[in-house]
Amino acid sequence: MVKVAVTGALGRMGSGIIQKILETEGLNVVAAIDIPNHPKKGHDIGELIGIGKLGVNLSTSDELESVLKSSGAEVLVDFTAPAPCVNTAKIASKCGVNLVIGTTGFTKEQKDEMEKAIFENKVAATISQNYAVGVNIFFKTLELLAQKLGEYDIEIVEMHHKFKKDAPSGTALRAAEIIQENLNRNSNLIYGREGITGERTKEEICIHALRGGDVVGDHTVIFANDGERLELSHKASSRQSFIAGVILAIKFVGTKKEGIFNTFDVLGLN
């Protein structure tokens, strides 16, 4: 039985992950954590998310170290925000707790700081911009398309709900990274266009970020050439696609002693 702690426990992803863990054989929720001074601190997390009493009370991140130690958590799942996630990763690593990180929007410095803590404390972590199985097949397909259609004009379009705080999405940025890694030419990443931009250069890869409504996550990469256009799309209709991948990552990282992994490792795509 893998003992799991979840931060951002009352968020959209956190509450969904808790519910899915409880439905999954071999996994158990032992701690649920949210922001400091949360008014619901001490209340049963199951009752707070509407699934009935679980016997696990909501804790807050300012007491994370003691909660991890007292609960015996083996894996911590974090879908929060960059700054608190870095702090959480440092504390969890110090406590010998493995990590599943789905937070996006890190600066290079934040990511380096987090990875340093993971390596220094010799724990295991999966870090991914998107845990959906379909998205990772999308990523794998992009490798081939970039290799074969590298001379085409490439544009990336993503759309998310109006509450998303970072732009472009981590998934769109990862798609751009994969394309750049597999192109046989120089490339230049830009974000949207405005004004008199002049003709499009061959080196441009442009990301367009759209926000509105309750869109869970749409991503399309366009390869355009004279006379034809190829579009590769992934559209998420619910967060269950992400949550299913998180469960696979929890099981995967629960068997590892140390190292940083991604969803290609989890799914055997490397």
Curated annotation (Swiss-Prot):
GO cellular component: cytoplasm
EC number: 1.17.1.8
Keyword set includes Oxidoreductase: yes
Catalytic activity annotation: (S)-2,3,4,5-tetrahydrodipicolinate + NAD(+) + H2O = (2S,4S)-4-hydroxy-2,3,4,5-tetrahydrodipicolinate + NADH + H(+); (S)-2,3,4,5-tetrahydrodipicolinate + NADP(+) + H2O = (2S,4S)-4-hydroxy-2,3,4,5-tetrahydrodipicolinate + NADPH + H(+)
Gene Ontology BP annotations: diaminopimelate biosynthetic process; lysine biosynthetic process via diaminopimelate
Keyword terms: Amino-acid biosynthesis, Cytoplasm, Diaminopimelate biosynthesis, Lysine biosynthesis, NAD, NADP, Oxidoreductase
Annotated (S)-2,3,4,5-tetrahydrodipicolinate binding sites: 161, 170-171
Annotated localization: Cytoplasm
Active site (catalytic residues): 160 (proton donor/acceptor), 164 (proton donor)
UniProt: NAD(+) binding residues: 8-13, 34, 102-104, 128-131
Positions of disulphide bridges: none
Pfam name, any one: DapB_N
CDD domains tied to this protein: DHDPR_N
Gene Ontology molecular function, alphabetical: 4-hydroxy-tetrahydrodipicolinate reductase; NAD binding; NADP binding; oxidoreductase activity, acting on CH or CH2 groups, NAD or NADP as acceptor
PROSITE patterns per record: DAPB
Enzyme class: oxidoreductase
Domain of life: Archaea
Recorded metabolic or biological pathway in which this protein acts: Amino-acid biosynthesis; L-lysine biosynthesis via DAP pathway; (S)-tetrahydrodipicolinate from L-aspartate: step 4/4
Family designation: Belongs to the DapB family.
Annotated NCBIfam families: dapB
Function: Catalyzes the conversion of 4-hydroxy-tetrahydrodipicolinate (HTPA) to tetrahydrodipicolinate.
Name of the molecule in the record: 4-hydroxy-tetrahydrodipicolinate reductase
Source organism of the structure: Methanococcus vannielii (strain ATCC 35089 / DSM 1224 / JCM 13029 / OCM 148 / SB)
Lineage of the species this protein comes from: Archaea, Methanobacteriati, Methanobacteriota, Methanomada group, Methanococci
